[in-house]
Amino acid sequence: MPLAVFAAPTFSALIAVVILSYMTVGICMWYSMSWQQVLRDLSVLQCGINFLPFGIGSVAAVALSAYLLPRVAAQWIMAVGVVCVLAASLLLATQPVQQTYWQQTFPAIVFLGFCPDFVYLAAQIIASNSVSRKHQGVASSLIGTLNLYGNALGLGVAATIETEIVKGSTEDGSSQGENSVSGYRAALYFGAGIAAVSLLLDFAFVRMPKNDREGWEEEIEDVEQEPDVLVASAIQRPSAA
């Protein structure tokens, strides 16, 4: 990984926005399913059906972001994605333990479906415009990798928060059900908090660099050009007798 890519304008801030937003996505996906299975005692099949709006929202987000990218600055499209996951985490964190699916869980899952594609597509455009051509592949790969790392990192931190909250509630004499609810809410509020930080970073530091480059006229300075070596081969033919 060349360190030069992190010196590009807005690139470091872009990395922070992407990883924080994907941390929240992972937290919301895990705890929305856990809430339905553990606290509401729904079957795995019912939980899978309840999560179908996520896929529908993701498909709609791809089409909508493709329409918006030529018309709206990429950082604002990314901001819309972060707002969606922020709204999803707040809806999930504030829902009662027993509530109809359509009241808060359904809109939260729909909002959640819009975040990954809005953030990912906008981040790819910004990353490609922020670095030189020789680093565009590396920058794009890094954005894709942050999806997985963000999900894993977010779940790791959220699970630690949940465990500590449950441990503290148990020492206070609370019931097991109350402990689980408190831990889930704390993890989801943590996700909302880092999504809010991601949104602030996007507004403050992430910008779409202007790209005036045409064709492949940009010279790559650090690539050594080897001189052409001409090898002449002499072909001797036997003389006629």
Q: Can you say where each PLM-predicted feature lies in the sequence?
A:
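Intrinsically disordered, low-complexity terminal tails of fungal membrane proteins
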Residues: 208-241
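12-transmembrane solute porter fold
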Residues: 1-169, 180-205, 209
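Short linear motifs at secondary-structure transitions and domain/linker junctions
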Residues: 51, 179, 220-224
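Interhelical loop segments of eukaryotic multi-pass membrane proteins
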Residues: 1-5, 170-176, 213-219
